[in-house]
């Protein structure tokens, strides 16, 4: 591993993979790029099962929201009902893992990439779907809140693997240039699942039973398992016996990363809400979290870490490093908007929660469609850098336009602004992973995908925590303008976020109500202003990327799906399976161009 860290280049040039090289034309593509192989039944059955599993995973993240009150009453959950939501995302996103008493396992999101290299994709994917299905069954049959929480934890563990492995398998099956359009389809269904979840949950609770919020996954997940078993055949497991493989897992790195993220999020979540930011617990948590991240990076790059779960070589290439940062910022901004637009609708426009969901539909629909369009555009052009430039530029402008929102903004203006921001956020969603892998060798696909999924997950949570902290801090600064003591007590120290409903605001006299709305308007304005900075940093980060040409050929020596094209890999005796093998080939690889990773001078 030490050789790998030292041997792989630290420049902006991608590291080509080993294989027979097709003639390269003057545009950087191979002469055979124009001919695309047709995809047969094996591929489409596999892809359909991946789409369905990703959709179900996203659906379960939101479907419970409208069913929670009914579930809480049925199981007499009282205040514990919140864990039904939190426990799902804890195991999935590795944030509060260190605080979750019911979990003793290590962090799962990044480690799935390492497990995929050691044991292969096929059985790991089937196992993740089975775990998700078992968790759904436990939740549906729950007779106590503790049983329900345990089932949600199991669901979350399965969902963590599904989200990462779906993307990784597509990387195995498709050349770089074709990945964008298929990622676009996947993300469109993921967004669709997140959007329709609350509506479906309400219908199932009203018409059938809250238990079918969970039972509905079982038949569809069963179909996915059958399809994956018969049609997904990828042989890329590592060598060695079970004990040897277990020894290669980066347990300490995973633990250190989870603890660091959890410590930072504790400070962001409870700072200025439960405790003031000057409180020792908040300061210590934030400092320990930041130091933990630094320690994690040093450990991953050190000789003590033989098999890093997040090797620093992923970030030594300027294109992959820039795309990773852009991934984090794009996800952060998307949830920044997704969570605070509804708050604006209810606290300032004074609409109901149901009406707020309807008003958010333009954002959700355009977000899904633009994700699909962005992936297709990447496949069409064979490049990604200019797409990222345009997207983040529009994202920065879009966040700026949100600062004009107030109580008198018309619905037409709101819809237009939503669509602008959604278009900007959605277009790069399906091609950021492609940009990362265009600059890295295929041997790093699993680890690069695991890191991509982790940064996206962290961006999801920070995209809520950071603007919430900004909002609460600004609201408390403006709160002295409010003279009503009842309103002050309800709104201070984080209460403003919880009380952002039309019912609460309308419960006060008109003069007090006007002041409350004004404070909400100015607090949200600060949220959008800081959001401009994050989007702007994303635009600047794109300058790190090189304008790489995406190839249309895929080496398939490890893939048994018959309709996947056989190209340069047919003449390759063996492909390096470990980073060390890749490093040993580095002097040769630097002199060659891969069929799907061509270098270009920008």
UniProtKB/Swiss-Prot annotation:
Name its cellular compartments: Cell membrane
Q: Topology relative to the membrane, per the entry?
A: Multi-pass membrane protein
Say if the entry is tagged with keyword Cell membrane: yes
InterPro entries linked to this entry: MFS, MFS_dom, MFS_trans_sf
The molecular function GO annotations come to: transmembrane transporter activity
Can you quote a single GO CC term?
plasma membrane
Q: Which UniProt keywords apply?
A: Cell membrane, Glycoprotein, Membrane, Transmembrane, Transmembrane helix, Transport
Q: Does the keyword Transmembrane apply?
A: yes
UniProt region (Disordered), positions on chain:
1-33, 564-602
Domain of life of the native organism = Eukaryota
Q: Where is composition skewed (Polar residues) in this entry?
A: 564-585
Transmembrane region positions?
43-63, 123-143, 156-176, 185-205, 212-232, 251-271, 282-302, 325-345, 357-377, 386-406, 410-430, 451-471, 524-544
What residues bear carbohydrate chains?
A: 317, 580
Which family does this protein fall into? Answer: Belongs to the major facilitator superfamily.
State the protein's purpose: MFS-type efflux transporter; part of the gene cluster that mediates the biosynthesis of the mycotoxin pyrichalasin H, a tyrosine-derived cytochalasan that inhibits the growth of rice seedlings, but also inhibits lymphocyte capping and actin polymerization and alters cell morphology. Pyrichalasin H is indicated as the responsible agent for the genus-specific pathogenicity of M.grisea toward crabgrass. PyiT might be involved in the excretion of pyrichalasin H.
Its protein name is: MFS-type efflux transporter pyiT
């Amino acid at each position: 591993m030490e050789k790998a860290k030292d041997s792989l280049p630290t420049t902006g040039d991608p590291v080509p993979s080993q294989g027979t090289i097709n003639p390269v034309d003057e545009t950087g593509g191979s002469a055979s790029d124009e001919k695309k192989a047709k995809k047969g039944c094996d591929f489409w059955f596999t892809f359909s099962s991946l789409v369905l599993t990703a959709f179900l995973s996203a659906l379960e993240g939101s479907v419970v929201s409208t069913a929670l009150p009914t579930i809480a009453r049925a199981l007499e959950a009282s205040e514990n009902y919140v864990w039904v939501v939190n426990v799902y995302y804890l195991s999935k996103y590795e944030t509060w893992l260190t605080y979750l008493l019911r979990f003793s396992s290590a962090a799962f999101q990044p480690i799935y990439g390492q497990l995929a290299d050691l044991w292969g994709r096929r059985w790991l994917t089937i196992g993740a779907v089975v775990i998700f299905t078992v968790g759904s069954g436990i939740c549906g049959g729950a007779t106590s809140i503790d049983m329900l929480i345990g089932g949600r934890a199991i669901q979350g563990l399965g969902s963590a693997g599904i989200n990462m492995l779906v993307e990784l398998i597509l990387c195995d099956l498709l050349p770089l240039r074709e990945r964008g359009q298929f990622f676009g389809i996947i993300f469109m269904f993921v967004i669709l699942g997140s959007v329709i979840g609350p509506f479906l949950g309400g219908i199932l609770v009203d018409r059938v039973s809250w238990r079918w919020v969970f039972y509905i996954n079982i038949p569809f997940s069963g179909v996915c398992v059958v399809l994956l078993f018969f049609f997904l055949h990828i042989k890329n497991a590592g060598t060695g016996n079970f004990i040897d493989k277990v020894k290669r897992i980066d347990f300490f790195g995973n633990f250190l990363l989870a603890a660091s993220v959890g410590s930072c999020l504790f400070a962001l979540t409870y700072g200025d809400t439960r405790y003031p930011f000057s409180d020792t617990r908040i300061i210590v948590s934030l400092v320990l979290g930041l130091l933990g991240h630094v320690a994690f990076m040093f450990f991953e790059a050190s000789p003590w870490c033989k098999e890093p779960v997040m090797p620093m070589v992923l970030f030594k290439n300027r294109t992959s490093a820039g795309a990773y940062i852009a991934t984090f910022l794009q996800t952060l901004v998307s949830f920044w908007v997704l969570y605070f637009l509804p708050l604006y609708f209810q606290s300032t426009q004074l609409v109901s929660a149901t009406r707020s969901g309807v008003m958010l539909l333009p954002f959700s629909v355009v977000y899904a469609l633009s994700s699909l369009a962005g992936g297709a555009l990447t496949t069409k052009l064979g490049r990604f850098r200019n797409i990222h430039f345009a997207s983040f530029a529009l994202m920065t402008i879009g966040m700026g336009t949100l600062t004009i929102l107030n109580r008198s903004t018309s619905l037409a203006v709101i819809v237009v602004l939503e669509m602008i921001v959604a278009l900007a956020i959605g277009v790069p969603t399906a091609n950021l992973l492609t940009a990362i892998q265009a600059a890295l060798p295929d041997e790093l696909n699993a680890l690069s995908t695991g890191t991509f999924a982790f940064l996206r997950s962290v961006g999801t949570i920070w995209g809520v925590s950071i603007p919430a902290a900004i909002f609460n801090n600004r609201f408390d600064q403006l709160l002295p303008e409010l003279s009503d003591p009842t309103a002050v007590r309800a709104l201070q120290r984080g209460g403003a976020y919880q009380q952002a409903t039309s019912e609460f605001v309308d419960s006060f006299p008109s003069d007090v109500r006007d002041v409350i709305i004004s404070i909400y308007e100015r607090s949200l304005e600060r949220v959008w202003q800081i959001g401009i900075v994050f989007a702007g940093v994303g635009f600047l980060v794109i300058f790190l990327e090189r304008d790489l040409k995406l190839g249309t050929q895929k080496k398939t020596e490890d893939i048994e799906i018959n309709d996947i094209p056989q190209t340069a890999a047919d003449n390759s005796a063996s492909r390096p399976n470990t980073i060390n093998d890749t490093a040993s080939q580095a002097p040769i690889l630097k002199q060659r161009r891969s069929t799907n990773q061509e270098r270009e001078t920008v």
